[in-house]
Amino acid sequence: MKFNKKILMISAATLMLVSPVTSLANANTVSAASVKKVSYAKQTTVTVKKKTPQLFMATGGRALTTGKYYKKGQKLTVDQLGGMNILANSSPDAYHIKGTDYYVWAKDVKAKRALQDIDYTSRGLTTVRTNKSKAPLYSFDAEKSTPAGYAFMKGTDFKVNGAMYLYNAKTDKSELYYHLTNHYHTMANLKTSPDFPNRFNTELVDTGDAFVKASDVNFFSGKKLKPINTAASAKDGSKIAILENQEADLKDLLGKVDSVKNSVKYKLSSSLKRDNYDLAVRDAQTQGNSRKLMSTAEAQYLIWRLKTYESELDGAKVKVGNMNKLTSNEKLAIGLLVISVYGKNTDKESLYGYAKFNKGNDKTFTLTIKDMHNQKKVVSTKTMKISDFAQKR
């Protein structure tokens, strides 16, 4: 792959991170002395108060049991505490047992020290919320890129995985933006919603790779994102040709795409995460093969996207006790993984894939994929090896 090293002008935009404002009801004054600071431990010992099941986490943070139990009085070293999905309105807390793939219900143990409570399914994720109707989307050059005829409602939540300054050559300004993690979003169809924003009809829309301006959103939850660059570097980098080390990094990242796609972490990631990685690869390949001049700012961004989306691939096989004798919960865990891998919801199709296990056969299952937009018509059926989705614990 060859990159043209001539100077390229790339526009971008800058944004200030907006933090939610917290107010005290009735203007009450709280003194510093009255606020007790909690010191959380990185790990602690818990003592089992009563016989309690050994848990493992399936796809979607689903809590399932292994069939084994912890005994009353047993001591365990734990290093995380968080809510687990039990298909109910609540997500009860469970401790992760250090050095294992197992968990134990928090209510059934007594902890020596406090651990900070996290959300297992959303840890590492960041959500921002629009503070106005019709908040626009932007491309890397800071030009508005909202699909024509569509708009976001006030209060729309976005999963974002990066914050960066982009330079807009037309306005000669750098502003900060959040990078949207996914490229499919629910939007109001303005053509069929004449009373927007009071009433509206929505559709799932492919917005492509996009940003939202920080001033148009408020931080909602998750990890605070630190910008990967500065306003000055965004402007300066748009006027400097791609650097040799950046060219080498891009070649290395694109050179290992086949290896990534053949890995378990890719194959067993959700279809959404695979699509996100695929889009980052396609965009980097397109930019690298085009005659368009590439700047160091654009190269930095393409490298960041490839590394970020590869790191978000999290596919893994279900760990089971006996590959020749699966428990009902182990089969359920495999089934949940299959749904995540083969389910797909885009602006063009809605597919649902599920596993059917045959009695007395723990070697294979039948994968069925249905088109949910076409009266649940069966698209395909295929015999799959369980060993491609599970491994001995």
Positions of PLM-derived features:
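Beta-rich interaction/scaffold domains
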Residues: 228-364, 370-393
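A short, surface-exposed beta-strand/turn
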Residues: 104, 111, 197-219, 306, ...
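Beta-loop motif signature
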Residues: 30-177, 181-204, 214-241, 259-270
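Short acidic, gly/pro-rich beta-turn/loop elements at beta-sheet edges
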Residues: 20-21, 26, 58, 114, ...
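Gram-positive Sec-dependent secretion signals
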Residues: 1-37, 393
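Generic alpha-helical hydrophobic packing signal
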Residues: 75-77, 109, 177, 364-368, ...
